[in-house]
């Protein structure tokens, strides 16, 4: 069955492509030269570590990792416990408060509990230089994450794609809407959230879709690992 495939199964060949090896080499060279690159090396592929291919129910596409100290840890929109909640995630929490009964905004921005339920939190570029947004946008990560989206499209069925903002929507243009459920809205950034992200109801609609397919809905209340044990 397709859902038994792992990321390793479907990405092993891609990871041997010259462009990908060049990307890794460029990032490694920058780190070795003393440039601070986020997230830390051990966290770059966390989205795949926490959400196996066969478990993917929802895909949320981010763009660049956060470029401030201690923020990025390999999951789009998420920050480690103890780090201030970034504005886009605060707006996501506002939308959840307004649409999910009983949701109360947590005091942290750590979304690992979403990832472990099957929400792939995928940035389209997986590294960034400290303080320099989009500094790694042309390194080859976009080619890799295009492949990831293509593989989900091909090997899974009935996945909900939440595409916020023009970048994510262009990235998701290849998704087969007969096989998957695609929801679009403006980005939750303070610059655009009032243009239709607020009120998009995506978190509710995603769960309704999953329930219609007989799948367990996502508990959108982010819990820290110690709280969920």
Swiss-Prot record:
Enzyme Commission number(s) of this protein: 3.2.2.27
Keyword Transmembrane helix carried by entry: no
UniProt keyword annotations, A-Z: Cytoplasm, DNA damage, DNA repair, Hydrolase
GO molecular function, one term: uracil DNA N-glycosylase activity
Gene3D superfamilies: Uracil-DNA glycosylase-like domain
GO BP terms: base-excision repair, AP site formation via deaminated base removal
Any one GO CC term of the record: cytoplasm
Pfam families for the chain: UDG (PF03167)
InterPro entries found in the cross-reference section: UDG_fam1, Ura-DNA_Glyclase_AS, Uracil-DNA_glycosylase-like, Uracil-DNA_glycosylase-like_sf
SMART domains reported for this sequence: UDG, UreE_C
Catalytic activity field: Hydrolyzes single-stranded DNA or mismatched double-stranded DNA and polynucleotides, releasing free uracil
Compartments, as annotated in UniProt: Cytoplasm
Active site, per annotation: 64
Predominant cellular place of this UniProt entry's protein: cytoplasm
Top-level EC class: hydrolase
Summary of the function given for this chain in its UniProt record: Excises uracil residues from the DNA which can arise as a result of misincorporation of dUMP residues by DNA polymerase or due to deamination of cytosine.
Family to which the UniProt record says this protein belongs: Belongs to the uracil-DNA glycosylase (UDG) superfamily. UNG family.
Entry protein name: Uracil-DNA glycosylase
Species for this entry: Escherichia fergusonii (strain ATCC 35469 / DSM 13698 / CCUG 18766 / IAM 14443 / JCM 21226 / LMG 7866 / NBRC 102419 / NCTC 12128 / CDC 0568-73)
Name of the gene this protein is made from: ung
């Amino acid at each position: 069955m397709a859902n038994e495939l792992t990321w390793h199964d479907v990405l092993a060949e891609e990871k041997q492509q010259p462009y990908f090896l060049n990307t890794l080499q460029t990032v490694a060279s920058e780190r070795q030269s003393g440039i601070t690159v986020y997230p830390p090396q051990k966290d770059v592929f966390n989205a795949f570590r926490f959400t196996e291919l066969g478990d993917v129910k929802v895909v949320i596409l981010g763009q660049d990792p956060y470029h401030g100290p201690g923020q990025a840890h390999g999951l789009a929109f998420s920050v480690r416990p103890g780090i201030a909640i970034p504005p886009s995630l605060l707006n996501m929490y506002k939308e959840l408060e307004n649409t999910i009964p009983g949701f109360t905004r947590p005091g942290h921005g750590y979304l690992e509990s979403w990832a472990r339920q099957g929400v792939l939190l995928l940035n389209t570029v997986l590294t960034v230089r400290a303080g320099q947004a989009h500094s790694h946008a042309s390194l080859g990560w976009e080619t890799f994450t295009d492949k990831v989206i293509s593989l989900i499209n091909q090997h899974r069925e009935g996945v909900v794609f939440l595409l916020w903002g023009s970048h994510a929507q262009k990235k998701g243009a290849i998704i087969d809407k007969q096989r998957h459920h695609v929801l679009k809205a403006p980005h939750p950034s303070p610059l655009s959230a009032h243009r239709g992200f607020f009120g998009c109801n995506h978190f509710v609609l995603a769960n309704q879709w999953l329930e219609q397919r007989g799948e367990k809905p996502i508990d959108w209340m982010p819990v820290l690992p110690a709280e969920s044990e």
